[in-house]
Amino acid sequence: MYKRQAELCRKFGLPDKKQYKDYSTGMKMKLCIAVALAHHPKLLLLDEATNGLDPVMRDEVTDLLLDFTRDENHSILISSHIVSDLEKLCDTIAFLHKGRLLLCEEKDALREEYALWHGTAAQLAALDVRVYGKRVTPYGAEALVRRDAMPAGAELAPVSIEELFVLMVKGECAE
C-alpha cells in the first residue's frame, strides 16, 4: 500500500520532502485522494472534495476523480455545493433541499427533460403547464418546465443543472 501511495503522490506532483502542515489546501486534498486510492477502493465517498480550492487545483482534482471513474467498476458518491463539479463528474444527480429529495435522475436525462421558457409575466400567468420554478423580473419571466408538456413549437432554452437547482428552490418548486 505504501508503495502505491508514494507512486500516487509522485503522479499527483506532491513533494515528498514537505511536511503535511506546509501543504496548500489543494495539495492536502490531493494527498487525501492518494491515500484513499492506495487502498484500491471501488467506491469513494467524498464530502465537499473541491471546496476551498482555486479553479486550477479544482480542475486537477476533478480530473483525478474522472480518471478513477473511467474504470466502470469504480464509483464516487460526492456531496458538493459546487454544481460545475457535479456536472463534470456525475452521471446521476440527487438534489436534496431542506432534507427533502427534490430529484434523483441521470444528468443527461435532466437536461433533456427540463427546459427554460422565456416570456412576459402575462404570458407566464397564461401558461397552461406545470411550472417547476419561475423567476419574474421587470424585464420578463422565465419558467422551468418539462419539454414534453409544452405545446409544439414553443421556444425553449436548455437548462443547466445549476439553473435547475436554483429555479426549483427560489422558484418555489411544486407550488
Positions of the model-derived regions?
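Conserved protein kinase catalytic domain
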Residues: 2, 9, 62, 111, ...
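ABC transporter nucleotide-binding domains
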Residues: 3-84, 88-97
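A generic structural signal for secondary-structure junctions
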Residues: 13, 115, 122, 169-170
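Non-catalytic surface loops within mature trypsin-like serine protease
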Residues: 31, 121, 147-149
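Short, surface-exposed beta-strand/loop "edge" segments at domain boundaries and coil↔beta transitions
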Residues: 44-45, 123-127, 149-153
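ABC transporter nucleotide-binding domain
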Residues: 62-145
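C-terminal coupling/interaction segments
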Residues: 132-175
